[in-house]
């Protein structure tokens, strides 16, 4: 957080002085799952409507967007995805303010953006972009805390690195026993946990070759639950907030 405090603080002050009409996120893969987390952070802490832009709308359909006065938040590990760049360019033309959360600081996306928040995750050498995903979550929370000025959220930021270390030190191996022999998996979360569930499902696909699908605990009952039978594994992410009871009820 210290490395980005100056840029995030200045951006937050500017956004408070001239609030955007709404927020548009744009990302692919793991970064899009970080954007799903950002939606809940911005909407719950700032009351700011946040929507995800499909890059294909600009890169394939070349459709003109009405984003005047919007905050366009692009999240990317490499900052080189052609369709993401095309959408960011379209956002600038449409009058949006472009902010990039990007791991490669000298990338084309960084050069295009009005403001760059570096992720500082280091080089991603594996296909599964875990470091930059976690760094993107932290950057989103940093911006949200400074922008909102919410005292409890700002006070909690310094404890986050320690909490991550504690999570890393936990022995999670017992959870893998339920996946032995599995061919399919549901990963369930809600609210802030939905973006985490989406990313976990992707990681199971990428690293384990396991067919995993993520659902909101509010949506999984509307059709997908029909697939669940005896010995069908379901992994639930239940954070300690008002969504917990509903997620546990699904479990």
Residue ranges and their predicted role:
Residues 180-246:
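Acidic catalytic cores of enzymes that act on phosphate-bearing nucleotides/polynucleotides
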Residues 12, 173-176, 225:
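Short hydrophobic/charged patches on amphipathic alpha-helices used for structural packing
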Residues 1-22, 163-169:
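An N-terminal, well-structured beta->alpha segment
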Residues 157-178, 187:
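Active-site/ligand-binding-proximal alpha/beta "capping" segment
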Residues 69-72, 176-183:
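Bateman (tandem CBS) regulatory domains
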Residues 7-9, 152-157, 175-176, 215:
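Flexible, glycine/charged-enriched surface loops at secondary-structure junctions
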Residues 5-9, 51-58, 98-99, 167-170, ...:
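Short gly/ser/thr-rich secondary-structure transition/capping motifs
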Residues 18-162, 190, 225, 230-231, ...:
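Glycine-rich phosphate-binding loops that contact phosphosugars or nucleotide phosphates
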């Amino acid at each position: 957080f210290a490395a980005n405090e100056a840029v995030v603080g200045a951006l937050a002050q500017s956004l408070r002085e001239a609030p955007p009409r709404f927020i548009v996120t744009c990302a692919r893969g793991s970064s899009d799952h970080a954007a799903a987390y950002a939606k809940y952070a911005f909407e719950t802490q700032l009351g700011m409507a946040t929507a995800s832009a499909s890059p294909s709308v600009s890169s394939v359909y070349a459709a003109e967007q009405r984003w005047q006065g919007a905050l366009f938040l692009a999240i990317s590990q490499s900052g080189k995805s052609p369709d993401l760049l095309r959408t960011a360019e379209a956002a600038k033309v449409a009058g949006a303010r472009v902010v990039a959360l990007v791991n490669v600081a000298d990338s084309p996306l960084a050069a295009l953006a009005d403001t760059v928040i570096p992720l500082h995750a280091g080089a991603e050498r594996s296909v599964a972009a875990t470091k930059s995903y976690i760094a993107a979550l932290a950057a989103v929370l940093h911006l949200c805390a400074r922008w909102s000025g919410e005292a409890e959220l700002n006070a909690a930021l310094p404890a986050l690195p320690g909490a991550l270390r504690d999570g890393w030190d936990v022995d999670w191996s017992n959870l893998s026993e339920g996946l032995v022999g599995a061919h399919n998996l549901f990963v369930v979360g809600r609210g802030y946990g939905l973006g985490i569930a989406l990313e976990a499902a992707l990681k199971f696909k990428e690293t384990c070759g396991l067919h995993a699908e993520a659902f909101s605990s509010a949506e999984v009952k509307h059709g997908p639950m029909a697939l669940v039978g005896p010995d069908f594994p379901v992994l639930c992410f239940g954070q300690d907030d008002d969504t917990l009871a509903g997620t546990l009820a699904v479990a």
